[in-house]
């Protein structure tokens, strides 16, 4: 995800950022180092949130100037929405929702629900960074969850960039599942 961290850093200058499924805060750190005004980092694992805080400090950033929450991402997004808060950039990069091909229908429903919640807290004119690391979710189906979420909310969205895994993770044309990362 290093190329995606670079992109987030480039887009984040002057923005408020919310990052869910953040793990140790790679995207959060990229946004903060890129000049985000405030970054909220959410992951359900307290140990991951503590690591994210340490990563901010190790990179010369004051963790107290940002928000770190060990919480369920869906629950946190619902609370943010209920409070009427919005962010200029919202990042959602969950663990694989489709560990098997059989899980694809449930995974697509989960992505749609996640994307709808995320879109509800994106400020007008803001950015949603949505990622999937599941090899069982085709790119077109993943993009379809964004289209469905936007339609449910009667919001217009457009794609600025589509990224995949970097050159050091090549895939074979005959094995489309090898192109697992969509962002």
Q: Model-predicted segments: where are they?
A:
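Glycine-rich adenosyl-nucleotide cofactor-binding module
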Residues: 1-36
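A generic alpha-to-beta junction signature in SAM-dependent methyltransferases
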Residues: 12, 60, 84, 121-123
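Short helix-capping segments at alpha-helix termini
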Residues: 35, 57-63, 151-157
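A short helix->loop->beta-strand "cap" motif at the edges of active sites that frequently abuts
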Residues: 36-37, 123-126
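Conserved SAM-binding motif I beta-strand of class I
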Residues: 38-43
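S-adenosyl-L-methionine
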Residues: 47-91
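Mobile active-site "lid"/loop adjacent to the S-adenosyl-L-methionine
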Residues: 48, 87-117, 123
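C-terminal catalytic and target-recognition region of SAM-dependent MTase-like enzymes
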Residues: 86, 113, 127-183
């Amino acid at each position: 995800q290093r190329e995606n961290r670079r992109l987030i850093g480039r887009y984040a200058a002057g923005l408020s950022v919310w990052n869910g499924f953040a793990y140790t805060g790679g995207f959060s750190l990229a946004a903060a180092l890129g000049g985000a005004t405030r970054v909220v980092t959410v992951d359900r694992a307290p140990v991951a949130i503590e690591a994210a805080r340490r990563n901010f400090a190790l990179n010369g950033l004051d963790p107290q100037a940002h928000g770190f929450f060990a919480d369920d991402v869906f629950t946190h997004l619902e609370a943010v929405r209920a409070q009427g808060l919005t962010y200029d950039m919202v990042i959602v990069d969950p663990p694989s929702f489709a560990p098997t091909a059989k899980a694809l229908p449930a995974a697509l429903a989960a992505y749609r629900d996640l994307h709808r919640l995320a879109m509800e807290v994106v400020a007008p004119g803001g950015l949603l960074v949505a990622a999937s690391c599941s090899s069982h979710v085709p790119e077109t189906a993943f993009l379809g969850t964004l289209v469905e979420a936007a339609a449910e909310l009667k919001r217009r969205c457009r794609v600025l960039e589509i990224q995949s895994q970097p050159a050091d993770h090549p895939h074979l044309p005959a094995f489309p599942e090898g192109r697992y990362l969509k962002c």
